[in-house]
Regions:
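Bacterial carbohydrate/catabolite-sensing allosteric modules
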Residues: 1-182
Length: 182
């Protein structure tokens, strides 16, 4: 039982593109170690393609573990390598919070200089300044359906199923609409 990570990540990139961002970075995950990272990265690539935006993995992607410190370090590397980035999709809210701090420490502002979208909808995202725009997963439904699937698996061990639960893009204050000035 999961959120459809590909679809959610795709919607983030398309959302940023509709806001006028054409140089979007992606921070987080390790594509060879976690399935979640791979699915979110795949969805982000779909978003670039659907929005007719170019994506150069070497210039626009920086892997990291799912923590604030790793997000901070990855964002510093990415933004030092590619100064044209106007928005970042962080593969988790913790990565996004570290990224926000890196942006601030580089003398830039969120969202005025660089917009950011996280993923998970953790409570802290509502209390940081600015409030984080994030993909919110229905954790209550994920837990309930996960238990149901586990019990089903115990009773019917050869009947594998995979289900997804809806996601919502929660608009905070961390994304700005570009008007052509950047």
């Amino acid at each position: 039982m999961t959120t459809c990570d590909e679809q959610a990540a795709q919607s983030v990139i398309e959302y940023l593109a509709k806001k006028g961002h054409t140089s979007i970075g992606v921070v987080g995950g390790n594509l060879t170690e976690t399935e979640i990272s791979f699915r979110r990265f795949t969805g982000a690539k779909w978003g670039f393609k659907n929005s007719k935006l170019s994506f150069n993995q070497r210039l626009q992607y920086e892997p990291c573990r799912f923590s604030m410190e790793e997000g901070y370090q990855a964002a510093m590397r990415l933004l030092n390598r590619n100064t044209a980035i106007t928005a970042i999709f962080a593969m988790s809210d913790l990565i996004a919070l570290g990224t926000m701090r890196a942006i601030y420490d580089m003398g830039k502002r969120v969202p005025e200089d660089i917009s950011i979208v996280g993923y998970d909808g953790i409570a802290l995202s509502r209390y940081c300044v600015p409030r984080l725009t994030t993909v919110q997963q229905d954790t209550t439904q994920l837990a309930k359906k996960g238990v149901d699937l586990m019990l089903q698996r115990i009773n019917y061990p050869y009947h594998a199923t995979h289900k997804t639960t809806p996601f919502h893009l929660i608009e905070g204050e961390s994304v700005i609409e570009l008007n052509g000035d950047k």
